Amino acid sequence: MADVVLGIETSCDETSAAVLVNGELASLVILSQDVHKVFGGVVPELASRAHLTALPRVVDRALAEAGLAPASIDAVAVTAGPGLAGALLVGVVYAKSFAYAGDRALIGVHHMEGHLFAPAVEDRQLAPPFVALLVSGGHTLLLDVPAWGHYRLLGQTRDDAAGEAFDKVATLLGLGYPGGPAIETLARAGDPGRFSFPRPMIADGFEFSFSGLKTAVLHAVRASPDLERDRASLARGFQDAVLDVLVTKLERAVVATGYTTAVLGGGVACSRALSGLAAQRLGARGGARVAVASPRLNADNAAMIARAGWYHLRLGERSDWTLDARADLPLPGLEMTVTTHPSLRSGQAPARRTDFS
């Protein structure tokens, strides 16, 4: 039984390690890479090199904060994809080496499944069925989750992810990277009625599109006679449009499924404006509960990877030594069971349980 799990996350620009003991978080270390800020976005080669340097120290610190020696680790869970290929490879190679050296179990985890499990790190009573909105720099996914390990894709973005749109609009407004926190801070001082931007596809099913909204902001920026005066209101108008679309789709999914719980996950879920609007509108619609993790668990982190890995390990699932990083690792869609990685040994999906609390 894998009671002590080391989680490793290196999919983008955070180097993270965490230790989970019997499902409880014992330690979490996240080292952010500040080197990218000057470029206004993540430089893949720099990210890979930074992970190479930082990961051994981050793992050592996570073990020390948990008060455990390496020999205490039963299993290693690592993000196998999707993400930046080089960055993922650093984590996967380290995890395989650590696991092999101690004859430990190894499990590859899908990054977005990690985000799905993030609220369960703090709320062990969280259990399906629920609707999940996972919003990050690379993904915008709306899922029907009838049980852990079973994910039905309701909708996703057709172009830019919501987090990507925030980063690009932040650049247009002369703000820093990452764009989401910068826009949210600036938007608090903006006039919500000054700029009204389109809500793309807001009336159309569960799909998303943010490219046209980004273009509308670009035109407004170019047309502004005083950008310094308008910057905060532009940020507010853009943020209001994105959040309105996200929450409207989430509301629609809750109604369609009849579920009483909605989960928010991913880096964009760090936004208090998003979680607040979702709680307000879903609460007004009959008391549906919104489950969202604390900001440090919504950002990329190893605790969520350890939690997802712990779930799969308790089902007897393992990855073999052919585990490899996949930048495009897919999250299976309608009626398909998400697997942690194609190298899982079991040829038949085991029965799923929902009571691992």
Q: PLM features: what roles do these ranges have?
A:
Residues 1-345, 349-357:
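Acidic, glycine-enriched active-site microenvironments
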